[in-house]
């Protein structure tokens, strides 16, 4: 199967219905990631088919479980999960935050080439980031442990908002280290097409 066919099969397995233009944008995103990765080392994954599973489908597996209009992707890196979210949900407002200049250079170019008018890229350390408005959902995929994630981002969470962290195996120890005023709302096991590994979405909120 080519990349487009693999994507279609993966979306069907996830039960996600995207338009043909959205599917093309996701394929183009993988191609951009592959091209820039050769110079900027954005991901250890080197093959486009694996990038599709490890990065795009892994991000999209969490998409139906995220509820909010203003989303912050912390430590966005190569744009996961923020860019797949932005392509799939054009009515959402996405902010991709990373302190690494090379990564945000890629992100800015990807946003331009993909025509993502709902997406802003910010190069700044998360603890120094002071946006005009706070966020409904703060997400991360490979940023830090849960306690550190919450500590560094709590000033960015809107009232009633939630954290949504993509993790591998069930993070028992990380959950045990959370501060007392943070509750676990839900931990959902994710099944990612083409990925034979444990994946979980951890949703947290303030008590």
Curated annotation (Swiss-Prot):
Gene3D superfamilies referenced in this protein's UniProt entry, alphabetically: Vaccinia Virus protein VP39
Keyword flag Ribosomal protein: no
Binding-site residues for S-adenosyl-L-methionine, renumbered to this chain: 75, 80, 126-127, 141
CDD domains, sorted: AdoMet_MTases (cd02440)
Catalytic activity: guanosine(527) in 16S rRNA + S-adenosyl-L-methionine = N(7)-methylguanosine(527) in 16S rRNA + S-adenosyl-L-homocysteine
Compartmental location: Cytoplasm
Domain of life: Bacteria
Chief localization: cytoplasm
EC number: 2.1.1.170
GO molecular function: rRNA (guanine-N7-)-methyltransferase activity
Keyword rRNA processing applies: yes
InterPro entries: rRNA_ssu_MeTfrase_G, SAM-dependent_MTases_sf
Protein function: Specifically methylates the N7 position of guanine in position 527 of 16S rRNA.
HAMAP family the record matches: 16SrRNA_methyltr_G
Family named by the database record: Belongs to the methyltransferase superfamily. RNA methyltransferase RsmG family.
Record-given protein name: Ribosomal RNA small subunit methyltransferase G
Organism: Laribacter hongkongensis (strain HLHK9)
